[in-house]
Amino acid sequence: MSKRKSSSILDFFKKSNNGKNMWGNEAVSVEKTDSTTKPSTVKNAISSSQIKNEKFSQEVLLQFNDPSFTSEVGESPQWQSFGDANILEPLKNELVKNEESTMSELLLCPICGITLESLTVDANIHVNDCLDGRTTEAVSKKLKKDSVVKADPSNSSTFPISDSCKQALLPLPGKQINVRSVVPFYKLMPYNIPFAVDAFAYGAIDGVEAYFLSHFHSDHYGGLTPKWKHGPIYCSEVTGNLLINVMHVDEQYVKRLKLNQPYNIMGITVYVLDANHCPGSAMFVFETLQSNQTRRVLHCGDFRASKDHVMHPVLREKTIHKVYLDTTYLNPKYTFPPQADVVQACADKAISIKKSTDSRLLVVVSTYSIGKEKVAVAIAKSLSSRIYVVPRKMHIIKQLENQDLIDLLTDDPTQASVHMVTMMGIHPNSLLDYLEQYNSSFDKIIGYKVTGWTFQPLENRAQLSSSLDSIISRPPKFVEYDLRAIRGSTDKVAAFVAPYSEHSSFYDLTMFCLSMNIGHIIPTVNVGSQRSREKMNVWLDRWAWRRKKQGLLSLENVDW
């Protein structure tokens, strides 16, 4: 494959902003039981063995230039207003500050399998070049001996362990380590269902006969390589395309499932539902019999909850005995607005700027390897423009089975007013450098950093956030005026932050969990510290208490 003309784009977007100018647990069970049954307490919500296993919950694998873990779940900065000019500047992320777990796992390239720890080039660039069939640097494939703890000799795989946990996991003389004992409990399905979800970093897991992948983001497929041979991988059709044609996993192991259809897999009824996260993202519903009674499990993967989920025939008016919940934003401060509002605001802002000047405007939208395409598409349609992407991104998008998006793409950056790029951040200085590449075609540039961390609630909403009634009755709204520029923006170069997320907001989580008949909720994100778990348990218990006392929330006349 020929060398990409815009291969230096990553360098542009790693620069910091120095500009001076400014722009205008498990929740208590609520199944039908004897009225004298007392709800579980927070203290007993998580067992000590579960807490021990949670140390392995963060699989930080920066692959495919995909910041899905670091920018959405930890290291992306929040923002605060600067003076009275409605400008934003970075604010230290309180969630990161309070998080006690500092997991640092061994990073492996999913294509060639080498360790990425000692590369002199950016790890993301190396992986991207591997995807394009090129290698940026000759490196040894031999892993560091002190970076891996081997499992049972009968299991040919190894699994990465953080330095802080290594000593505690070294086997005693004559003892073997059971791989299953170090897999986070929330990745293993209950009721003797022999399935694991998003658990590819642990080799062959004892008792697991099938592996499920919720979506194609690196914090979920981490550990999966072309050499995978530990069992069938069940996923959506789009995710299957990506595994086979992008990651080159052996097709015999990839089992692509259609949405909304029942499958009998090893005696378990399985449904795949659209998770409303990134293209191909899936929620899994598992149904099994236990003591002649149906037990139903919902694993949400990463999802943006919506009314469509609650009203789905597979879930509507059903008892969901266990829900494995994406708790990325289980905090009242993250009651950010609906996707559609933010997408429209971004498009309206681009139109307003375009109409206010005779300049040739270039719009840059930050995306993941997959995900957040909706923003770029809306802007492109509003400007009657095509969308430029690099060859690697083009190849990935062609696996998504979205012909409308494919028809908008071009590999000529001068023929598109919208550029969709994968990067770690957008700042005025880096945008200026990017503009200089194409100064013969464009003379003004704006960029959008789209992430839920950017949302700042109104003061009165923050004060009312402790009331469930207030949360339910005050759905967040968002318009063009609410878009704020990052400090350092000028008339020529401006960077905006938009509270667009493909994870559920706190409002979404509240509506979802109050309107469904849920037995137990098991968080799958931010479970690495006792403090974080206790904070989440407060809300899980409040939701459960409300369901028990007031019944399920009706969505009949709710616009959500």
Swiss-Prot record:
Q: Which GO terms describe its cellular component?
A: nucleus
CDD domains from the xrefs?
SNM1A-1C-like_MBL-fold (cd16273)
Binding-site list for Zn(2+) = 109, 112, 126, 130
Q: Mind telling me which SUPFAM superfamilies this protein's record contains?
A: Metallo-hydrolase/oxidoreductase
Name the major location: nucleus
User: Which keywords describe this protein according to UniProt?
Assistant: DNA damage, DNA repair, Exonuclease, Hydrolase, Magnesium, Metal-binding, Nuclease, Nucleus, Zinc, Zinc-finger
Record carries keyword DNA repair: yes
Subcellular localization:
Nucleus
Under the heading Pfam families, the entry gives: DRMBL (PF07522)
Molecular-function GO term, any one = damaged DNA binding
Enzyme's top EC category: hydrolase
EC identifiers of the protein: 3.1.-.-
Q: Where are the zinc fingers (UBZ4-type)?
A: 106-135
Q: Does the keyword Hydrolase apply?
A: yes
Task: Give GO BP annotations, semicolon-separated.
Answer: DNA repair; double-strand break repair via nonhomologous end joining; interstrand cross-link repair; nucleotide-excision repair involved in interstrand cross-link repair
PANTHER family according to UniProt: DNA CROSS-LINK REPAIR 1A PROTEIN, DNA CROSS-LINK REPAIR PROTEIN PSO2/SNM1-RELATED
Which family is this protein grouped under? Belongs to the DNA repair metallo-beta-lactamase (DRMBL) family.
Function as written in the Swiss-Prot or TrEMBL entry? Required for DNA interstrand cross-link repair. This requires cleavage of cross-linked DNA to generate DNA double strand breaks (DSBs). This protein may have 5' exonuclease activity on single-stranded and double-stranded DNA, which could be necessary for the processing of DNA double strand breaks prior to religation.
**What name goes with this protein?**
DNA cross-link repair protein pso2/snm1
Say which species the protein is native to: Schizosaccharomyces pombe (strain 972 / ATCC 24843)
Starting at the broadest rank, the lineage of the source organism is: Eukaryota, Fungi, Dikarya, Ascomycota, Taphrinomycotina
